[in-house]
Structure formats: C-alpha cells, structure tokens
Amino acid sequence: MQRKFKWNNIEIIKNYFKTLSKYDEDSIIDSINLSDMILFSILKIYETSEIQSYKKSLEFDKTFMDQNTSDFEKNKIEDFIKMALDKKVRFAKPVYDFDETKMLGSTFSFLSTVDNIAEKELSDAIFDKRLYIRNAKLLRNYTGTTYSISHNPYYEILQYSNGNSSLTLTHEIMHGYINKLTDRKFYKDGPRLYIELVSLLSEIYQNDYLYKNQIISFEEYITNTNDILLANVTEEIEIIDLLFKLSKLENVPEKNEIDNLIKKCAIKNPNYNFTIKKLTCRPLESLLAYLYSFMIAVGIYENNKDNSKEGIKTAIQIMKDVDFDSEKDLLCYYGINVNESYSKFVDENNLLVEKAKGSI
C-alpha cells in the first residue's frame, strides 16, 4: 500500500521514550508505562489482565463503583442495562470496502468540520512523529489507543481488513483534542465515565459524513453503525450486567456463587455463556466508560443529527463542565434522554438493516 508518509516504527518509539523522560511519573496515566509500550508497539502483543485473581478484579470493580461513581450514574446505568438487554438489535452482513489509502485524507476532511484545533492535532501528531499506524491481521481487543503524556499524546492505530480505521483514528485524535481543552481532567479526578464521550460521538458523526460525501457505500455505513453498537453496547452488555450486579454485593462472592448467578441469568438470556475467567478480562470501569459515554453520545446525536458541529460542541461543553454535582442538571439542560435516544438509534439501525436485506 502506498502512503504519503513512511512510518518508521523504531524512530517513533525512540521519540516516545525521549518525550517520556521529560515528564514526572505522576503526569503519566498509571496504566501506561514503558513495559506497556514495549508490549504494544515492539512485540505487538495486547494482553488483558486475566492473570489477576477474580477476587482482586471484583474488589477493584466494587471500589470503583463505591468511590468513583455517583448515585445518579448508578441509577442511569441500571435503567439503561435493563433496556439494552431487552432491546433487539439487528445486524447486517458486514461489508468492509473502505480504501485505507484514503484514511488520512478522509479523517482530515471530517476533522476540518469540527474545528481547526482537532485538525491541527492530527497534523502535529504526524509532524512530531507521535502517530504510529501499522497493519494487523487479526482483530484483538483494541483497534487503537492513546498514550496520554501531558498535552502531547502518542497514538497507535491498527489497520484491519475488517474495519474502518478512519473512525478509529478520529476517535483517538479526539482524545488528544479533548485532553488539551480540559487539561487532562479525566485522567485526574473528573467523572471517569465521560472520558469516551467526544470520541464516540465523533465516530457516529464521521460515519454520517463519510456516507453523505460518498466516501463509503450504504452497506459500509450500516456495517460501521453495527460495529459501533456492538463495540459499545451489545457485545458486552451481559458481562456489564453481571459485574454491575456483583459490584453491589456487600462482599465478593465465591466462585460457585458466581457460577450459580450466571446460570440463573442464562435461563432468561442465552448470551450469558461466558466462564468466570471473563470476569477478569476487563475492569468494570473500562466497560462502563464506553457504555456510559455512548449513552450520552447517542442522546446528543439524536438532538443534533444534522448539525455535527453543534453536537460535538455540546459534548465538549459537557466534558468541560461535568462533575458529580452538576451532571444531572447538565443532561437536563441539554435535553438528553438516554433511553429514548438509544431506542431511536437502534430502531433506525434496524430499519437500515432491513433495507439492506431487501425486506423493505
């Protein structure tokens, strides 16, 4: 594949280490360290935390829910989980025809509709050698990541044959963009469940943009919408439901108690087909960050379908202003009805899927 830019992986990694040495350890997000960078970018391995015992994992989940989420958030999550488990989402046969040579161009083009700071962040990341793009044969647990170092994050994007990495690139660049606007608020003490808000909303808007500008086909548009729903809700909703229930218990239950709970849930929902090992794959904090941010993102999107600039502006303002005392009033002020908006989003997705199948 021909590209305008030649990605010198070793040079980028050296530059990362050089930049890393300029900052105090406290300025770097705890979960990103030198060994992570080696695993991610040199050995090209991504492993989850399955080596942790399930009790430690569940204790971490419980601590997060007790200390880092508000009662308002807990109630929102509980209501949304119930609805999402009942709401049937239809999926079309996936079509991946996106021309990856257009990835940078289409990303620049979309970001220019957001504002010049977002567009400049992508340009600077390329110029400063902070962007690392590589091909990947198999889909693992992530398609991209942002290594947040002060205001100059590093980005790693994986290109797959079964995905649109332009959406991934936009998602990660918007993390760097929002870090600049909020002084890395969500890596400090901000409400952590909002950390993915602008990034996920940008994915939805960019998918619309690519389709309206005939950069992707109708089938690709539906595939992207399906993938967004899968990644943030439907693929993980059962494990989120279980972990959420476990986090509310006074003590971490024994394995046999959890097995029994899984079996009870499976009677009503056959998608409860995971083993206890799945409980340690990803912490509840990470799963809820995507779920909760997506809930709010869809609420903003449904209110500003034809005005991506206003929608993203609203999301940015919420991320700037939100704290545990203001979030209820903020969502009310912007007229965000989470469950109603998600229901509309899914209904529209289902209609498009039926249209693609020729059923309507």
Regions found by a protein language model. Give the residues of each.
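Charged, low-complexity interaction regions
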Residues: 22-29
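C-terminal, non-catalytic "cap/extension" segments appended to globular domains
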Residues: 47-69, 83-85, 256-360
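Short pre-active-site segment immediately N-terminal to the catalytic Zn-binding motif
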Residues: 151-169
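Catalytic glutamate of the conserved HExxH
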Residues: 168, 172-176, 180
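Long, amphipathic alpha-helical stalk/connector segments used for oligomerization, subunit docking
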Residues: 211-282
